[in-house]
Amino acid sequence: MVASPALDLVVLFENEAWQQPLFDVLDQRGIAYEKYDLKSAAFGGHDLPKARLYFNQASPSAYVRGRLRVVPFTLALLKNLQIQGAEVLNGIDVFSFELSKSAQIAKLNELEIDHPRSIIFNDAEALAGRNDLSFPAMLKPEQGGSGARMNQLDSLDELRELLAKNPNLWEPDQLLLLQEYLPHDPEVGIVRMEFLGEELLYAMRIVTHGRFNLCPSEACNPVEAVKEGACAIPGPQEIDARPVEFYPYLDLPAEALKAGKQIVKSAKMDVAGIEYLETPDGRRVFYDINANSNLRKPIGEAFGFDPFERVADFLEQKLQSVR
C-alpha cells in the first residue's frame, strides 16, 4: 500500500468493530487518514505508508479470533516503521510490552506498585521444585487479551491435567503465567482507568459476575445485556454468569490515579487502559496493562463527553506536533 503524500494518519487495526466509532469521528472531521487492516497485509522495504502519524491499535488477543499472523506481522511492521523514523503512537516498544504479562509484572515491581505474584514457565514440571508455588492460582497466557484462556487452579496436579487435556492453552507463544489468586467481590468488580497521554480520560467500575472477558467495547459487551457480544470468549467459569456491567467511577482514589499515571509515564504509553482490583484485606492490586484501549461511549457520556471525540482531539494535537 503506497499512501498519498497528503496523508496525515494511518490507523493500524485488526478488529474493525472496535475501531468503527473512531473511524466515524475521523470521517466527520475530514482528517486525511487510511485504515491499515492487519489481518491481510503486505509491505516491502520501500513502500510503507507515508503518513505523518501512525496509530497502532493492534490487539494481543487477535489469535483468539483465529488471526495467528496478526501479531507477528504487526511487530515486523512496527519495527520497520521505527527504523524509518516514523512517528508511531504505541509503537514497537509499547506493543511488545503489552504482549508480555511478565514484562508488565516486572514494570509494576520496578515502580513498587502492588501486583500479583507471578511465575512464567514453558513446562509444568519446571514448577515442581519451586518453594514459591502456592494455590489457588490463576493460569494465564503470557500473551493475553480479552480474558482469554484463564483458569483458576487448586493444585499442580490440576494444572498438569488441564494442560494435558488442552495443549492449545500454550498458544500463541508457548509461555504461561501462574499468578497469585486475588479474592475480590465480583459484584463490586474491578476498576479500569483509560489514559490519553499521561492524562486520565475516565475511570469505570466493571462488575464481572465471575466473567473474564471484560472488553469494554460495545461490540463485545453490548449496552443491552440481552444482545450477544460479537467477540465473546466463553469459558467453563462463565457458562451461567450474568453479563458484565460497566459503570462510571466518579470517585477514583487519588493514589490509584497516581499509580496509573506512573505506569503510563514509565512505560512511555501514548494510550492505555489499566486495571486494578481491591482485595478483602485492603490491597489495591494492579494486574493488567493494555495499549489497545477499547473505549465505551456511554461511560464517556456519563462524564459529559464522547470518548472517541477526545481520541480524535488527541490525534489532531499529535499531528500538530509533527508538522
Task: Describe the residue ranges of each PLM region.
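Protein kinase-like catalytic core scaffold
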Residues: 137, 189, 201-202, 272, ...
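Short glycine-rich anion-binding loops that position phosphate/pyrophosphate groups of nucleotides
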Residues: 59-62, 143-144, 292
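Short hydrophobic segments within beta-strands
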Residues: 10-12, 196
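Phosphate-binding site of ATP-dependent enzymes
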Residues: 151-263
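Conserved N-proximal alpha/beta basic substrate-recognition cap immediately N-terminal to
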Residues: 14-117
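Extreme N-terminal starter segment of soluble prokaryotic enzymes
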Residues: 4-10
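Active-site nucleotide/adenylate-binding loops and adjacent lid/helix of ATP-dependent enzymes
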Residues: 2, 79-84, 92-191, 254, ...
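C-terminal active-site "lid" helix and adjoining low-complexity regulatory extension at the edge
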Residues: 250-251, 264-271, 278-323
